[in-house]
From Swiss-Prot:
Family the entry assigns: Belongs to the 3-oxoacid CoA-transferase subunit A family.
Organism (species): Bacillus subtilis (strain 168)
Cross-referenced PANTHER family: ACETATE COA-TRANSFERASE SUBUNIT ALPHA, KETOACID-COENZYME A TRANSFERASE
Protein name, per record: Probable coenzyme A transferase subunit alpha
Subunit structure: Heterodimer of a subunit alpha and a subunit beta.
Range of residues in the leader sequence: none
NCBIfam families given in the database record: pcaI_scoA_fam
Length: 229
């Protein structure tokens, strides 16, 4: 692929995802999720996935369909309350859920992208469930949990505008964890509403530099109905 021509097909973007892959998905309750890439991964039939995402989406929104169709073996997220299927699978033991407070989750992903081994945080230091099986250190007289950094085989993220080099801009709060995930995965693919020639995005507007992005696909749009509609 030419370095300045990263626009690819959706099928090409997901071609190397295999059973057992570790995937990051941007999105907050589906907002900022890459709908076309999620649908393609679902249609591909891959399973036993480890998914890192802010939340479990809704049954028909965001990463929800991957969970509903039992493609996810392990979910690392800050909450799952909006998707009752995820809660049911967790209590039945068919889905492993690793909860991480939202801010901690973001920083663990950021650490992964920065090449750090983890972060120190006092969030949950007095909660036995949060502290279980985690190391605690004392720095300047204060106790902290050591939270491991998070990385992935692939990050599938959503952008508003991409150029042909993979430089990305985002639409307001749809940005959420997408820029962090772009840096924390071995391979990153972005789904964008628009793909423009290189140079059309002002350098002041670029949030994710194209050096972090392997390929961009044009979004086919949201096919689900939002919860508030």
């Amino acid at each position: 692929m030419a370095p300045f021509q990263k626009a690819i097909s959706i099928d090409t973007a997901i071609a190397d995802v295999r059973d057992g892959s570790v995937l990051m998905f941007g999105g907050f309750g589906g907002v900022g999720s890459p709908p076309s890439l999620i649908e393609a991964i679902l249609d591909s039939g891959v399973t036993d996935l480890t998914v890192i995402c802010n939340d479990a989406g809704f049954p028909d929104i965001g990463i929800g369909p991957l969970i509903v169709n039992q493609r996810v073996k392990t979910l690392i997220a800050s909450h799952i309350g909006s998707n009752p299927v995820a809660g049911k699978q967790m209590t039945e033991g068919t889905l492993e859920v690793q909860f991480s407070p939202q801010g901690t989750l973001a920083e663990r992903i950021r650490a992964g992208g920065a090449g750090l081994g983890g972060i120190l945080t006092d969030v949950g230091i007095d909660n036995q469930m949060v502290c279980e099986k985690k190391d605690i250190v004392t720095v300047a007289g204060k106790r902290y949990l050591i939270e491991e950094a998070l990385t992935a085989d692939f990050a599938f993220i959503n952008a508003y505008i991409a150029d042909e080099f993979g430089n990305l801009t985002y639409d307001k709060t749809a940005r959420n964890m997408n820029p962090l995930m772009a840096m924390a995965a071995r391979r990153t693919f972005a789904e964008a509403e628009r793909i423009v020639p290189m140079g059309e995005i002002s350098e002041e507007m670029i949030v994710t530099p194209g050096v972090f992005v392997e390929g961009v696909v044009r979004s086919e749009g949201v096919k689900w109905k939002w919860a508030w509609e």
